[in-house]
Curated annotation (Swiss-Prot):
Annotated GO biological process: proteolysis
The family this protein is said to belong to: Belongs to the UPF0758 family.
Presence of keyword Cell division: no
UniProt domain MPN: residue ranges: 113-235
PROSITE patterns the record matches: MPN (PS50249), UPF0758 (PS01302)
InterPro entries: MPN, RadC_JAB, UPF0758, UPF0758_CS, UPF0758_N
Organism: Crocosphaera subtropica (strain ATCC 51142 / BH68)
The protein's name in its UniProt record: UPF0758 protein cce_2495
Pfam families the UniProt entry points to: RadC, UPF0758_N
Position of sequence motif JAMM motif: 184-197
GO molecular function: metal ion binding; metallopeptidase activity
Domain of life: Bacteria
Length: 242
């Protein structure tokens, strides 16, 4: 499929920039957002910027994965292998992708109150959300649930990470925390807890009862999504925390 229509040939109300101003970025197609970044078109068939955006998505789709999944981690040279994409266009796209990651991953300031799973996710996204290997991390809180700090405890493979509950308990005491949230990522993006996740959470809840420091939640992060095991399971009813 080719796209010969130029942006100048499109009615002004239907051009990507004008549409973004009129209806907002979230209502634009992915190819339109790419067109705004590209600025101009070209490539085989002298494609318009929108056409080149479609062409990029088609080329990335050949990998049998979601094009946006590939785009998130693509290199400049991989982008430049697509006809019509030179260094200027490639670096503009990659800079926009990285900026999007950073705005999503913004960390709360130290001493911010972590009063919801979403606040904890914000504190951990930089370390966990987009990683290609499983990371297990902890969020340490004071008695008012204010953030003391975060720490990645272990790094595993693409499908698992091994965690010793005793190490979690030691680190919690070392940090002088009054409450704890643990979290890990699923690189697949499927944040449904596995049986191993549930078993580990049960062990941690039992152990935290013994050291009298509450485990507030166990979060699973991945591909922009998250799951709170406190909300999704009955484990906290079975093993109440102080």
């Amino acid at each position: 499929m080719t796209y010969h229509l130029r942006i100048a040939d499109i009615p002004s109300s239907e051009r990507p920039r004008e549409r973004l101003m009129a209806v907002g970025a979230k209502n634009l197609a992915t190819a339109e957002l790419l067109a705004i970044l590209l600025g101009t078109g070209q490539g085989k068939g002298k494609l318009s910027a929108v056409g080149l955006g479609h062409h990029i998505l088609q080329e990335l789709s050949k990998h049998r994965r979601d094009p946006l999944d590939i785009l998130r981690d693509i290199s400049p040279h991989e982008l430049m292998s697509i006809d019509g994409i030179g260094p200027a266009k490639a670096t503009t796209i990659i800079a926009a992708v990285e900026l999007g990651k950073r705005t999503f991953q913004v960390r709360p300031l130290e001493r911010v109150t972590i009063d919801s799973p979403e606040a904890a996710v914000a504190a951990l996204s930089h370390d966990l959300m987009w990683e290609r290997r499983e990371h297990f991390a902890a969020v340490f809180l004071d008695s008012k649930y204010r953030l003391l700090g975060t720490k990645v405890i272990t790094i595993g493979t693409a499908t698992e990470t091994l965690v010793d509950p005793a190490e979690i308990f030691r680190e919690t005491l070392k940090q002088g925390a009054n409450a704890l949230i643990v979290a890990h990522n699923h690189p697949s993006g499927n944040v449904e807890p596995s049986q191993q996740d549930l078993d580990l959470t049960e062990q941690l809840l039992k152990g935290m009862q013994l050291i009298r420091i509450p485990l507030i939640d166990h979060l699973i992060l991945g591909e922009g999504n998250h799951c709170s095991l406190h909300r999704a399971t009955d484990l906290w009813q079975r093993y109440p925390q102080e």
